[in-house]
Design a protein with these regions (language model features):
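Conserved catalytic or regulatory cores that recognize and/or transform ribose-phosphate-containing ligands
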Residues: 1-182
Length: 182
């Protein structure tokens, strides 16, 4: 079975509202090019972009975080993190303490994006070698039309502080792949 096809799943983590263009570029340009390069090696690449994969019912039933973390588990060891100036949505309800994701009970006030990054990369070694982080340069906002800029700026001063702290944790985590900032 040396010639059997293998599947590589890549989880894309970011806030949704401000990273549409970056996610679109990955999905429409980068991943198709990677698929082409991997096909001769019998590797099927699947990108997991949950922008369109979360239903209204899942949102209403507080299932979003568990769904995201489940998908990260399915994608191990591949993780791509995109961070701009938004911290992201903070869930009001976290998974039950007795569940697989009970560790989140001590993470009150953290965004889904931060919890994805912690679960996927920072809390274990499985994804460290295959995690890639890209931080968008805040100066980028200078070129964004004012009407769109509000969707790409921090939700609040507190959110900006949390995001800055998260970025620093990622930078200082000793990951083998350097954080790309531009």
């Amino acid at each position: 079975m040396a010639n059997a096809w293998r599947t590589a799943r890549v989880f894309i983590s970011s806030t949704f509202r401000d990273m549409h263009s970056e996610r679109d570029y990955l999905v429409k340009v980068v991943f198709p090019a990677l698929r082409e390069r991997l096909e001769p090696h019998r590797v099927h690449l699947v990108d997991i972009d949950l922008r369109w994969g979360i239903t209204e019912q899942q949102s209403e039933n507080d299932e979003v975080l568990a769904l995201c973390l489940d998908q990260i588990d399915e994608c191990r060891p591949f993780f791509v993190g995109l961070l701009g100036e938004r911290y992201g949505w903070v869930p009001k309800k976290l998974p039950d303490a007795g569940s697989k994701y009970g560790w989140t009970q001590h993470q009150t006030g953290k965004s889904v994006t931060e919890l994805e990054i912690r679960w996927g990369v920072l809390l274990g070694d499985v994804m460290r070698d295959h995690a890639f982080f890209y931080f968008r340069d805040p100066a980028f906002l200078n070129d964004v039309p004012p009407a769109k800029r509000t969707e790409m700026t921090s939700e609040s001063d507190e959110a900006a502080r949390k995001l800055a702290a998260l970025k620093e944790v990622i930078r200082s985590a000793g990951l083998p792949n350097p954080v790309v900032e531009n």
